[in-house]
């Protein structure tokens, strides 16, 4: 718009990460790392309960102290949300703080219900996506207050609609959250995975997306090799243009033996893609997950595997990794990486899926 002054600037993810690390360092001057959970590059949770008496400050004064320190050392304006639990702190920042002059939102269970039970849209709330919002709207539920009322009148219906996720939906409708900072810090997954996902910049056709699926699998396999890991299965998730309101496609394929072999994994994942993806709907998101990854260890070949061919492929993988490490990720590519629909070269210049 002509009447608004603004700057058009390219995103610089590497710079953002450097500033994020600096700001985290500022927080460590006041709060121990055990009481901080980094949620994203620009957001973290802090349990400051035991620090209020130490610094002789109220919760709001503590937030202001941290915000002032960030401003003084980086020139960046911070925003804070204060809540009696993690969920309320998040909502206080996401919804309340942006409408307050000092950028500090505050909520407890009662004020949450008073201020936000009628708030719209529902997708403003943490963990409620547009699809969940549309699903609820189909039954006349448009606010958190509506969800709270439904939990009293027909809780079984919510569980039938959303399964185990209904428990979290109901808790959040009432402003409750059972997870504490200690739970986050003590949580360790029994199974580990490695994933590669991206949002496409336009609708991709079935064949164009097949090229991207092969590229992403190739990158995932080399990541496994570089880390000395193998997997026994891969999950593929495909999401479509939201205007078609089509459910995402999802499938998992298992390998006869744990593997990180490029040809085996690329061909198998492409076959899975061609089996589960809708060839007639524009594709916008792709995610590939290597499940139950474990350290590679000693590789024992079966009677049905060509050990010489496998060793040759492994030497090729290691050579590719060495070239990329020395000369850059785009120093060596497959021919398909030069296709117009390829995202390989652009993503190699990104950090965490964002422009570096």
Task: Locate each region found by the language model.
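Gly/Gly-Pro- and Ser/Thr-rich, intrinsically disordered tail segments characteristic of DNA damage-repair
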Residues: 1-171, 308-356
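Short, charged/polar, Gly/Pro-enriched secondary-structure boundary elements
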Residues: 52-55, 244-245, 294-299
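A glycine-rich phosphate-binding loop feature that marks nucleotide/adenosyl-phosphate handling sites
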Residues: 84-87, 171-174, 230-241, 283-294, ...
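Acidic, metal-coordinating catalytic segment for phosphate/diphosphate chemistry
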Residues: 250-251, 255-356
């Amino acid at each position: 718009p002509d009447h608004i002054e603004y700057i058009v600037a390219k995103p610089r993810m590497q710079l953002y990460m450097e500033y994020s690390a600096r700001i985290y360092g500022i927080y460590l001057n006041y709060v121990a790392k055990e009481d901080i959970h980094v949620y994203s590059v620009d957001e973290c949770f802090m349990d400051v309960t035991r620090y209020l008496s130490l610094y002789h400050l109220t919760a709001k004064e503590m937030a202001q102290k941290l915000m002032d320190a960030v401003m003084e050392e980086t020139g960046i304006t911070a925003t804070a949300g204060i809540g009696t639990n993690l969920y309320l702190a998040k909502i206080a920042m996401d919804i309340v703080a942006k409408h307050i002059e000092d950028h500090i939102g505050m909520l407890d269970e009662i004020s949450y219900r008073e201020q936000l039970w009628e708030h719209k849209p529902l997708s403003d709330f943490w963990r409620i996506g547009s699809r969940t919002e549309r699903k609820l709207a189909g039954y006349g539920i448009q606010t958190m207050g509506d969800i709270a009322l439904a939990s009293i009148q027909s809780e079984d219906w919510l569980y039938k609609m959303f399964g185990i996720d209904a428990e979290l939906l109901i808790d959040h409708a009432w402003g409750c959250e059972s997870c504490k900072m200690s739970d986050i810090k003590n949580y360790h997954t029994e199974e580990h995975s490695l994933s590669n996902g991206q949002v496409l910049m336009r609708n991709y056709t079935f064949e164009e997306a097949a090229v991207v699926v092969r590229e992403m699998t190739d990158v995932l396999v080399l990541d496994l090799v570089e880390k000395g890991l193998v997997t026994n299965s891969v999950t593929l998730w495909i999401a479509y243009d939201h205007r078609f309101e089509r459910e995402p496609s999802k499938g998992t394929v298992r390998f006869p033996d744990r593997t990180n072999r490029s040809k085996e994994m690329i061909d198998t994942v492409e076959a899975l893609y061609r089996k589960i993806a809708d060839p007639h709907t524009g594709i916008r998101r792709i995610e590939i997950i290597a499940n139950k990854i474990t350290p590679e260890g000693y590789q024992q070949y079966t009677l049905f595997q060509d050990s010489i061919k496998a060793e040759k492929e492994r030497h090729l993988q290691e050579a590719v990794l060495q070239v990329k490490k020395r000369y850059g990720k785009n120093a060596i590519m497959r021919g398909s990486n030069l296709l117009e629909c390829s995202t390989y070269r652009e993503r190699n210049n990104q950090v965490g899926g964002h422009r570096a």
